[in-house]
Regions:
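Short, flexible loop segments at the rims of nucleotide/cofactor-binding pockets, characterized by
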Residues: 41, 70-76, 98-101, 169-171, ...
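Canonical P-loop GTPase G-domain recognition
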Residues: 115-121, 126-182, 189-191, 220-229, ...
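Conserved hydrophobic helix-helix packing surfaces used for dimerization/oligomerization
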Residues: 14, 190, 296-298
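Conserved G1/Walker A P-loop phosphate-binding module
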Residues: 1-78, 82, 86-89
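Conserved C-terminal guanine-recognition region of P-loop GTPase G domains, centered on the G4
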Residues: 52-60, 65, 75-148, 178-182, ...
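G-domain G4 guanine-recognition motif of GTPases
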Residues: 67, 97-101, 118-135, 149-158, ...
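C-terminal effector/interaction modules appended to NTPase cores
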Residues: 1, 19-25, 203-392
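Long, well-ordered amphipathic alpha-helical subdomains in the mid-to-C-terminal portions
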Residues: 183-209
Length: 392
């Protein structure tokens, strides 16, 4: 992703669901105007999730996701279906392609989507070659409680209807969240203290830093940045103390001890706890750390799938802090990317990263899973603040 692109995590996620060879790939190609998904008459051509970022007038940045057919068979088919089901967790709006009156698989997916309160747009494709489109549309309406859009992806018929339907189904709260909330307003001075360690390769800032700076500029704040070792010098160079200081969780304690009394302090990870997740549940769950014992089991979940670094926060620094507090025998498991367990009951606590690479819907679905299983879940920044004795 370039610095001028909207991160996929901030885009409206529109997922196409349907049977094999129902025309999902053709439709995503028609919607995006590009041949990004392989099209074939052979069922099961799409073997993994295929995504395409684009802009839709009136909506803004979107991410279309093409899924494998949910009627796939065999061992490989089961793997494809599991990936399709995982896609539901990150879906903001679903396009459900319907084929005929054998509606068994469609009903299953429809029930899952409704359970997650995901808006559904039923679509009847291939009207250019069907003879019973109206009859089938009536049947689909009875099943979905909404009239399907009649289209032909191949002939580009009805594509604009889908774009309009997406606009109408846009969740009312989509895009309303912002990183810094009500912490700052126009003309406030904000200082970002950003340690440039091995996790931030030379010539690059990490995504949370980039997104936060951009938002602060949009809010017309006065934005200053410095590295940890230049924090004191930067404060001395300023005419007034910053209204807000934002730093990395790993240096939170050091910055807290040096900051002006009138300056508020938070971390990128704490900000992203509210931006992507449920900050109240995270804070409530962090208190569980006090009750952990060496026989407890903790799950640390990382959104990224990068190769582990020598001082990685999730794999090294956070486990070190936990074992220092709880004991060396504390069992800690690590998962990355989409490998998040369905069953969380073996764990006393889940600690998630800031999830800058995930959309809000995906993070909230993980929180919902933890809540349903009565498992506390917090994130890196909140956990580190608790372990360091800082609740700010």
């Amino acid at each position: 992703m370039s610095l001028t692109d909207t991160p996929n995590a901030n885009r409206l996620h529109i997922t196409l669901f349907g049977r094999r060879n129902s025309g999902k790939s053709s439709l995503i190609n028609a919607l995006t105007g590009q041949d990004i998904a392989l099209v074939s008459n052979t069922p099961g051509t799409t073997t993994d999730l295929v995504s395409k970022a684009m802009e839709i007038q009136g909506i803004g940045p979107c991410l279309f996701i093409d899924t494998p057919g949910f009627d796939d068979e065999g061992e490989l088919g089961e793997l494809r279906i599991s990936r399709t089901l995982k896609a539901i967790e990150k879906t903001d709006i679903a396009l459900l392609l319907c084929e005929d009156t054998t509606f068994f698989h469609e009903k299953e997916i429809l029930a899952l989507l409704k359970e997650k309160n995901i808006p559904v747009i039923p679509v009847l494709n291939k009207i250019d070659i069907r003879e019973n489109s109206d009859h089938l549309a009536t049947y689909i309406e009875e099943q979905c409680k909404i009239h399907p859009l009649l289209i032909s992806a191949k002939e580009k018929i009805g594509i604009e209807l889908i774009r309009q339907a997406i606009l109408e189904k846009l969740p009312s709260d989509f895009g309303q969240q912002n990183i810094t909330g009500k912490l700052v307003t126009e003309n406030d001075l904000v200082l970002l203290v950003m340690p440039q360690d091995i996790q931030a390769p030379k010539g690059r800032l990490i995504l949370p830093q980039v997104q936060t700076i951009r938002e602060l500029l949009d809010k017309k704040c006065l934005v200053m940045t410095c590295t940890t070792d230049k924090f004191s010098a930067t404060l001395q160079a300023l005419a007034r103390p910053p209204k807000l200081i934002i730093t990395d969780s790993q240096v939170f304690k050091a910055i807290y001890e040096q900051k002006p009394a009138e300056s508020e302090l938070t971390s990128f990870s704490v900000l992203f706890a509210g931006y992507k997740g449920d900050i109240h549940y995270y804070v409530e769950s962090a208190a569980v750390i006090e009750r952990l014992t060496e026989s407890s089991r903790v799950l640390i979940a990382e959104a990224c799938t990068h190769a582990p670094l020598s001082e990685d926060i999730g794999r090294v620094k956070l486990p070190r802090l936990l074992r220092k507090r709880i004991g060396e025998n504390l069992q800690i498991d690590m998962v990355a990317g989409t490998d998040f367990p369905q069953d969380l009951t073996p764990y006393s606590l889940v600690i998630h990263c800031g999830a800058c690479m995930f959309n809000r819907k995906y993070v909230l679905s993980r929180i919902e899973r933890a809540r349903e299983q009565h498992i506390p879940m917090t994130n890196y920044g909140v956990a580190i603040a608790f372990l360091n004795g800082n609740s700010g």
